[in-house]
Amino acid sequence: MTNSLFETAKPILEKLQAHHFQAYFVGGSVRDYLMNRPIHDIDITTSATPDEIETVFDKTIPIGREHGTINVIYKGEQYEVTTFRSEGDYDDHRRPNEVFFVRNLYDDVQRRDFTMNAIAMDINYQIFDYFEGQQDIKHQLIRTVGNPDERFDEDALRIIRGLRFQSQFGFHLEEATFTAMLNHIADIKYLAIERIVVELKKLTNGDFVSKSFNNLKHFMAFKYIPFFKHYDITKFTLRNAMPFTTFVAFLISQQREIDANIADLKVSNNEKKRIKTLVQLIDQIDEVQTKSQLKLFVYDYGKKDILEVLSYLDELKRNRITSISPLIVNDQTVTEVAKQLPMLSRSEMDINGKDILEIANKKSGPWLKETLREVEYAIISGEVVNFKPELKKWVKTRV
């Protein structure tokens, strides 16, 4: 069975082979192909060194030359081509002290994390599976390549990656792999938080997140991770896939007495803003008890975010985060109110701060922001029409 992404990348392998180098597809793309899952990225491994790769191809980018990786540009697409390599000792549970380029496929794949990721495939779709990765896929088993204690001692991130794969695929952890994860979990404290968060983002969004999250709790993994170590994760249950930012917001909302710094997660400013918005939304959702309060709530937070939070209502209740009044706040009422709102943002108001300053004949100050907010709410609640002459009259009676 062919695959369009592999077919598109075939000329890369053909050109390397034409120059007498070995070349194979490897890793996640081969695994996903064998599992009939969508393939997103193609990784190519070769006996050619970085210098030789650059000699073979006209357009290249040396994105990871020291690790043997060169980006090859072909027909507008970029392909990661990595030299067969072996690794020296690991001193910090994160990265090898040395990388050695080798000429043998077996030497390359034996350094990989899990058997299902150590499968290579040639240009004719012939499989090279030295560690029974296909059997483990068939039996839905996550097993390390070789000794699991050695694999996790080399790079503790493999523990989180293994649990991420469990969340995505629903596979079981092979017994020795499970035991080694438990034995080495404390080593994740040596990892950069950014690397951990990359895996956690995929983990919380997995279809089988419950199984994986329970293992994280069993391993007491969170006590070794910045930000999360301040929370009592045993109190939190995660049964359904959700974005990482939503998970963090729910955890903060559940344990508001904890004063942890979101900045410790090293996520983007947009993600931090998203978390804070969701926390504020959850804080206020219980206060919505009337139709007029619902109007203001929908105006402030928007239909999209409110409906997202409501889609996790079971998780919110299971974790005792909220006691929403379902008769007032539900998908139908939120959608209806959103349709009826006279405006969606302050930019649509038919009056602005300059107008109000002229009416009041006062200097600007905190009062102006408060007045603009009052005008907003008056429009949303239907107290006044969003029409400048009417708004001016309304403001005159209040400043």
From Swiss-Prot:
Cofactor: Mg(2+)
Enzyme class: transferase
InterPro entries xrefs: Bact_CCA-adding_enz_type3_sf (IPR050264), CCA-adding_enz_C (IPR032810), CCA-adding_enz_firmicutes (IPR023068), NT_sf (IPR043519), PolA_pol_head_dom (IPR002646), PolyA_RNA-bd (IPR032828)
Swiss-Prot/TrEMBL catalytic activity: a tRNA precursor + 2 CTP + ATP = a tRNA with a 3' CCA end + 3 diphosphate; a tRNA with a 3' CCA end + 2 CTP + ATP = a tRNA with a 3' CCACCA end + 3 diphosphate
Family designation: Belongs to the tRNA nucleotidyltransferase/poly(A) polymerase family. Bacterial CCA-adding enzyme type 3 subfamily.
Role: Catalyzes the addition and repair of the essential 3'-terminal CCA sequence in tRNAs without using a nucleic acid template. Adds these three nucleotides in the order of C, C, and A to the tRNA nucleotide-73, using CTP and ATP as substrates and producing inorganic pyrophosphate. tRNA 3'-terminal CCA addition is required both for tRNA processing and repair. Also involved in tRNA surveillance by mediating tandem CCA addition to generate a CCACCA at the 3' terminus of unstable tRNAs. While stable tRNAs receive only 3'-terminal CCA, unstable tRNAs are marked with CCACCA and rapidly degraded.
Note: A single active site specifically recognizes both ATP and CTP and is responsible for their addition.
Subunit-structure text: Homodimer.
Name this protein carries in UniProt: CCA-adding enzyme
